[in-house]
Amino acid sequence: MSGEPTDEDLEELRKKKMEQLKEQGGEGQSEAAEAQRQQAEAQKKAILRKTLTDGARKRLNTVQMSKPQFGEKVEQQIVALAQSGRIQGKIDEEKMKELLQEMKPDSQSFDIKRR
């Protein structure tokens, strides 16, 4: 084998280098996205801490334990209300109960009639 690389060798090296660069670029983007997600999560937690009383926070945590998707939806609603300025003061446990009742998905009931 001679000391000079062939065209095929050069092309293979280029492909490997391009793949490495793509991977490195992808890692940087995913790290930035992760950092942005963490920052948004921290901001959401701060807003919830500021707007909810201890009792309301406990009730929300209980809802999240039993129904995580519904709990997340309630959190998003509270954050949206707080950011738009539609919440005066703090949300106590009674207001949280009302909010949960309003947001509760309609349960489907089935009437079975026997003949």
Swiss-Prot record:
Among the GO molecular function terms of this UniProt record, one is:
DNA binding
Domain of life of the organism in this record? Archaea
| Keyword ATP-binding set for record | no
Location of region: Disordered: 1-46
Which keywords does UniProt give here?
A: DNA-binding
Q: Where is the composition biased (Basic and acidic residues)?
A: 12-25
Low complexity: bias regions: 29-41
Among Gene3D superfamilies, the record links this protein to:
PDCD5-like
Q: Which GO terms describe its cellular component?
A: cytosol
For the keyword Transmembrane helix, the answer is: no
InterPro entries recorded: DNA_bind_arc, PDCD5-like, PDCD5-like_sf
Q: Where is the composition biased (Acidic residues)?
A: 1-11
What the entry lists under PANTHER family is as follows: PROGRAMMED CELL DEATH PROTEIN 5
What the record says about family reads: Belongs to the PDCD5 family.
Mind telling me what this protein is named? DNA-binding protein NP_4416A
Q: Which organism is it from?
A: Natronomonas pharaonis (strain ATCC 35678 / DSM 2160 / CIP 103997 / JCM 8858 / NBRC 14720 / NCIMB 2260 / Gabara)
